[in-house]
Amino acid sequence: MEDKSKQCLQDPMCLGIESKHYIGSHGRHQVDFLEEMVDPGEISLDSLIFQRPEDEVSYQKKGGGPASSDNNELEKVLDSILDTSSSSHLHPWDDYVIPEFQEISVTSASSTKTLGDLTTDKKEAGVWTGTTAVENKSIPSLVPKEQDTLEYSIEGQLEGKGRRHGVLASRHPTLPPDGKMPMLPGSAVYLPGQPRHIEEDNDNYDQKHLSPYPCHSSCSHHDGKIKQEDSLYAEYGMPSSNPATPGPDPSLEYICKSETAAAYDNFRSTLGKSSDKAIPVLPTSSTTSQNLYQPLSLNDHQQNAYQSGTVNDAFVPQMHLSYEQYSRPDDPDQSSQYGFDALPRKICLICSDEASGCHYGALTCGSCKVFFKRAIEGQHNYLCAGRNDCIGDKIRRKNCPSCRLKKCCQAGMVLGGRKFKKYNRLKPGRELDRIATSSPMECQQALTRRVSNSSAQEVQYFPELLQILQSIEPEVLYAGYDYTKPETPSALLCSLNQLCERQLLCVVKWSKSLPGFRNMHIDDQIILLQYSWMSLMVFAMGWRSYKHVSGQMLYFAPDLVLNERRMKDSSFYSLCIAMRQLPQEFVKLQISQEEFLCMKALLLLNTIPLEGLKSQSYFDEMRSNYIRELAKAISLRHKGVVASSQRFYHLTKVLDSMHELVKQLHLYCLNTFLQSRALSVEFPEMMTEVISAQLPKILAGMAKPLIFHKK
């Protein structure tokens, strides 16, 4: 046997076969084999990856394998080489192995490592083709003479199921022809695709083989058939490939699936065809091997053998395209489907958590929805331990229920209010667009239907916010007037100043509880109070005069009511007549309590500095909200668009008339303050501060009154 092998090694015609199928006993002639092998410098790992399918196909046509007389000898040689009891062949292999092969380790069947463990090594060693079951203990086919190949076999411990073979091919590094690029894992061209389902024959064994090479499954591994799935192509808008028509290799469809249809079609059109156009490759800076495949399930068993590999950039024709081709298109259809604007983020208006929809009239999360419902139905009297400005974010929303409930009311949440659809199902403006494009008669009917529906719903919507305004309404204070002393103009003014001092404290407390007021800048809050304190107190006095004495007298306090005689005896009779017109107007219009509360809140926001406020935008929004609340309060008792509009006009005219009345009161108050010593009139400390700070500026025209109707 040794003579035959040596004689064949000297024959140039037999050199190719003998160098690939080494014959010896216990690895004695591996040194001779490596000495006769091709120059190791001409072998690279990249050349090991590529296999020429035409060579394997042509080899199968030749009949596969050497003469039958050598089969027994080759089988003995393989048994002697892979004999685990003897390690004589391992030492020469480790000594004379090519440096490029040192990173590839081979373990025996008794070792605990598997081929999957070897291939998942982080080093870029090569690509294992996996394991396959060989039927009827067939001996592996010899590689044709045209290839310089090293083949080794690992004897498995599967009794009656043949042997498991691993093939590691080595050739000269030659560039594959155009259009014949094998589809390999690890290349930057490909993106990880979804694993395909494997259809297996009942005659096959449990362990199947999946090769990453496009041609490998058709050449030697007929036991794994790829199942075509049309649904995967339908997701990308591409028709399923027809196996009857010639085209690219079908294994491409199981190896990878590109992210975009354009790139996928480019690869499919160029694969397997000679083309001068280079295959576009996405730019990448990755140098490490990546596992591009997920575990496949074969026969309901988990397959843990991952396949990975890298390829040299020299073997992949690259064309670095501009990043504009990979950017999001400007097409509105595509941008709405794949862009971020198609997925708007929904934020809770109360705690900034992710909102689940519109609950009780506001976009909130489920937690704030349940909290508001329980707080309103339970009628809890929450008190804030701080200054009514606690932070109510997602983490600290449960710390202060009082501030959380206040934010719910500020956001417009009302129990029993209008139920909106889910936020992600809303189609804003769709109904209005349909109304705008309809006929005039249909437009009028639709608007009438919308107004009637909204009126019926607002009857249930508004009272909950009114409940807040009613709860923060100050109590009626007593003046403490002493009727035992003789009534003089100075004594009356001193009693009114003491009453205004206490009422001013109530106004400050009321404004701090008013929804939305504390969210403004602190300087804006002070300025608004200094501008509106007089109008707020006079307006409240007019409401008491309307409710208690039907507008015939001035009801400053339960113990201080000025009738016609006492008005004439006072030093400000003309002002009393002007102030009495306010409750008389209330009697004429029959102002409801809901309307009064909304109008009073608007009086706080009725005058601003000429230069504006620091939080002017928020002030404008808050004022607009209370104007809308006034319109809702009007709709409670006045149905129809015409009646509501007329009612709104009259009420806003009353608010505009307050500017002239308050201006007269400011002028009289400032003159009395300047002559307080001569008139023997006392002014409390807070009254003194407010009058001296802002009244001169207001009378000098440095304040801007906000009016609804121009004169």
UniProtKB/Swiss-Prot annotation:
Expressed in which tissues: Expressed in all tissues examined: highly expressed in testis and brain. Also expressed in heart, lung, liver, kidney, stomach and small intestine.
Gene Ontology molecular function: any one: nuclear steroid receptor activity
S-S bonds: none
Superkingdom of the source species: Eukaryota
Region (Modulating, Pro-Rich): 1-347
Residue range(s) of DNA binding per entry: 348-420
First and last residues of each zinc finger (NR C4-type): 348-368, 384-408
Domain NR LBD: from-to ranges: 457-691
Cleaved signal peptide residues: none
UniProt record similarity statement: Belongs to the nuclear hormone receptor family. NR3 subfamily.
Official protein name in the record: Progesterone receptor
Organism in which the protein naturally occurs: Rana dybowskii (Dybovsky's frog)
Gene: pgr
